[in-house]
Amino acid sequence: MDIARDPLGGRNYEMYGEDPELVAQTAAAFVRGMQSAGIAACAKHFLANNQETNRNTTSSNLSKRVMMELYARGFEAAIEDGHVLCIMSAYNAVNGEFTSYSKKLLTDLLRGELHFDGAIVSDWGAAGQNKEGTLAAGMDLIQPGPNDMTACKQAVQEGRLSEEVLNDRVTHILQLIVEIMKS
């Protein structure tokens, strides 16, 4: 769902173009088609991930209007019209806060304003060392895999992560599995 903003972008071939409405229409159709074949689509990279150079350290500084009209539009369509089952966060920061750690983006915007009820997954390694902070922000699945189980359990035991939050994250993953198995 990324918007092609730089003609020299090395991954522009993965994007649907620079027009937010074209991206939105294409995203919704692609998600519907993929999911009609029993495959869970994963819309990525939420949000404003539009360059490869320094993408792990850069911040996309946006007004709320620009965020919603340009960068969130494709995700909105994938959610409303495509009923996408999974969304991947981006490496970059938005307005100084990394997306994988941002409650404003993952919980308030994505789940609250855009009404996404599927699974939110991190890009590979984007969660860094603060796994409980990522989960508390709204991330359901941290990639790469299962070597973080001990850290999550310890965070719950020490009160750094509530059991309620962890249960909510697991619920989203189980719901994703159930949806896939229905197909």
Predicted features and spans:
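Glycoside hydrolase catalytic-domain context in secreted enzymes
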Residues: 1-183
